[in-house]
């Protein structure tokens, strides 16, 4: 999608915008249901690796007092806080190991 957006593909840009808005809307629903949050965590494939997606999603959450540290947001492959120290909600990236989780669950069943 990024390559298509760079080539000026409007459908790709719309798909990207809908994805980011949908994630922010989903987060907002949980924020409302829980009457606020202390932290938001990005994980798994997109959450860990799609730096622009994280930035765009967080941009929708400004009403929560969330501010993004753009340098920290550029880090990949490690557990890191990507919000600024003065952000009212901590935002982090936590890498996952889905294969290990599946293995542990399987061992527990066997």
Predicted regions and their residues:
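Adenine-nucleotide phosphate-binding core of ATP-dependent small-molecule kinases
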Residues: 1-33
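Active-site proximal loops enriched in glycine and acidic residues that flank catalytic Cys/His/Asp
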Residues: 2-5, 16, 41-46, 95, ...
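Short, glycine-/Ser/Thr-/acidic-enriched flexible segments
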Residues: 8, 47-48, 98, 108
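Flexible, glycine/charged-enriched surface loops at secondary-structure junctions
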Residues: 30-38, 68-73
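Glycine-rich phosphate-binding loops at beta-strand->alpha-helix junctions
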Residues: 38-60
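A glycine-rich helix N-cap at a beta->alpha junction
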Residues: 62-66
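Glycine-rich phosphate-binding/hydrolytic loop that grips phosphoryl groups
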Residues: 73-110
